[in-house]
Amino acid sequence: GVTTIDKFDSQLTIGSVQGIKKIADFRTPRIDTYPEKRVELHCHTKMSDMDGVSDVKDIIKCAMKWGHEAIAITDHGAVQAFTDANHAVSKDDPFKPIYGVEAYLVDDLKELAVNSRGQSLRDTFVVFDLETTGFSPVKNRIIEIGAVRVEQGKITDRFSTFVNPEVPIPYRIEQLTKINDSMVLDAPLIETVLPQFLEFCSDAVMVAHNASFDMSFIEENCRRLGLPCSFTAVDTVALARVLLPALNRFKLDTVAKALGVSLENHHRAVDDAGCTAEIFEKMIRMLEERGITDLDRMNELGKTSADQIKKMPYYHCIILAANDLGRVNLYRLVSWSHLQYYNRRPRVPKSVLQKYREGLLIGSACEQGELFQAIVRGASDQELARLVSFYDYLEIQPLGNNMFMTRDDQEEPRTVEELKDFNRRIVTLGEQYDKPVVATCDVHFLNPEDEVYRRIIMAGKGFKDADDQAPLYLRTTEEMLKEFEYLGEEKAREVVITNTVNIARQCEKISPVRPDKCPPVIEDSDRMLTDICYDRAHEIYGQELPPIVEERLKRELNSIISNGFAVMYIIAQKLVWKSNADGYLVGSRGSVGSSFVATMSGITEVNPLSPHYYCEHCHFNDFDSPEVKKFSGMAGCDMPDRDCPVCGQPLKKEGFDIPFETFLGFKGNKEPDIDLNFSGEYQSKAHKYTEVIFGAGQTYRAGTIGTLADKTAFGYVKHYFEEKGMHKRTCEMNRIVAGCTGVRRTTGQHPGGIIVLPYGEEIYSFTPVQHPANDTQTDIITTHFDYHSIDHNLLKLDILGHDDPTMIRMLEDLTGLDAKKIPLDDKEVMSLFQNTSALKIEPEQIGGCRLGSLGIPEFGTEFAIQMLIDTKPQFFSDLVRIAGLAHGTDVWLGNAQTLIQEGKATISTAICTRDDIMNYLI
């Protein structure tokens, strides 16, 4: 063909096409050819909030294709990819998805007073502050020490000196501290200053604001100079979190202001130390007011509350479920992180993780993990030992993952060699403390070229460095061995292959959802349902039931009870009766109207028996007369009015001729789906009433997952390329949009779905739970999994809100009429579907509409009105059939409409509903 630029949309098109031939795929496939395979233990999917961009099924498919034996799914704070991962692998397939999470870990185990020996709060303290050339005690130097000695609550001595760092002071440090090279040029070296300072601190407890930073410099320099260093240290930042919970930030100036302490010359050591001393003195008084007089009791107070944990710094941490107990504990941790400890991120306190770590494997994660960060800041050997002891295995990652640390815009740019040293240090710690070290990719997209999707999403979120994407793709075994060749061939093989496989083999192949059905139990529900139905049947049809009633009731009850469905009917019955008692009708949706048991138990007003007459007074009934038989397949209300031949009272007209099989299937074993429309203004009360039925804590709202939609993704893509001044063809735009679509944005709740937990079961054995959209201000709790993922396990009640019951209640209040007593074949009501005469208005008064159905739900749209004009309904059953034709694709247009227009059928003879299929075609 001939390629041209289309003059309408300016897109490349091919004209004068003579033929089409499929070309071979020219892309080079990525395959893992190494004889032994690694296992990826750190992988994100689209369920990592606006971060991961790959579908879990594609990730698993790739790992299986490469011959890997397992892969760990570890999304940020969420486990919503688990069910799709489970569906991606058959039960018989040896491939093993490992279920985990990258948690936001909070170290609430660290004490307010480290190395406490129970000293009195009125003991001797040295409150000190350091100024340094940077943040690393290994790489950087002390340039000033300021301290005050406090005895019995009074300042008794001061210590202040510059220290010659023997290196130039960085410009940013000079700007921050106002200390320049000339000020420290003639100052003593640390070799002279530190022994003097230690003498000043003898027999005292050390106090500092963010003590871990200052103490790390003291400890590192003591180690370097061979000086003893074993102090008790109190951190006023941690203490402020306990004593000043109303604060959101705990910087020195913020805490000083909150306590009314003056701070001058901030970022000068002696002034900051004096300010911290005043702060600490006020804190001591606050502690004494609580009856706390020593450091041990202060540490007891420091056991953090949920509010404190929400304000503490968090670190990344990998948690893997090694078995089914671990899965339940993982769901418990995910739930509590969302419900109790959520503040921008779902946080997991170390103390809680420690308590429920059985069945779990805990990894140190990425550069956002506390171990990596401690190494970067030069933490002491003692601190590193404490951190390492918490983990089951340690992680290292490719240098490319952390290359952002070498950029000039970082506070302290690192070199590539330093990045290697950080990983080498982790490997050494693993050897020293007998912890396996594994190499992971921290996968956020499947292939290198997929970074464009994450780049655009991050740009859409406002990240200025979105274009500097780290290579967070899934690597082959050979690629990973090459990444870590600087460790030596043997060690690289160990961290890439041996250890990852060993960790994977410690995890059993489990299902993330329980396979069993766990419906709720209401004691004696079988008998209750039977009694309710027979009592109502006798009330309507008399003590001796007509054979058709007896047979239908017996057949339905047998199917319902034998399959364990009675409890579902009783639940629906209780909800409907409660709503009716409170003055609101309930509309039954869908096929529940085909169940005669639902009618007799008061769940629905729809009677599915064949059209018939019955007498409320003497219980006369007529199912079989020729006059009645003429209305087979129609609605009983369409039959002519009659008086009872026995007592002369007007007969009731009932029956819609709906087979039971349309509800519970041909064998009667299909689980009933009882959808109910409650008044919108009563819906919340109906939801609350489920707690009355089942008890508090036994019901949850059905959760949903909100993902990036096509149109939103298109907006992200379009805006990104417009900002870059780049033109992309529509086909390329659509390709990129497809890669961005489906990424999780938020969570929500089904408008009426209630998940019921049986007594004796724990929700965590089925799903984690959370607040919708992590709204901590609501008391609504939803399932963390999308409700479709667990609807085979737990009963879902559809308690939907609808305008119709509300409108009916309002009309009843306005008119004084009982809606249930208005006959369905009322002549004036039926005339609304043919003209406007009953309304006593002309079509011109309502925009030219020829019918009076504008205000009738489902019949007031332009499409529905045209259907009414085409079909000319005469009976109520015609309206039912029209409603059947109005739902579904190509049911009316080009189908039933054509048959009616051509005179081949009428609305009464066309196949319009499932009931017609059962009654006429089977």
Language-model regions, residue ranges each:
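OB-fold single-stranded nucleic acid-binding module
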Residues: G1-F26
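Conserved non-catalytic scaffold segment of RNase H-like nuclease domains
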Residues: L121-F231, P245-H267
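Conserved beta-strand -> loop -> alpha-helix junction used to position metal-binding or nucleic-acid-contacting
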Residues: F95-V106, P228-R241, R297, I362
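Mg2+-dependent phosphoryl-transfer active-site scaffold
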Residues: V53-E69, H76-A85, S90, Y99-G100, ...
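Substrate-recognition/cap helix-loop segment adjacent to the acidic, metal-dependent catalytic center
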Residues: M215-T232, Q373, Q382-L384, V388, ...
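Helix-rich "cap/lid" substructures immediately adjacent to catalytic or cofactor-binding pockets
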Residues: T530, Q543-G587
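Long, highly charged low-complexity segments
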Residues: F26-D32, K110-V126, L130
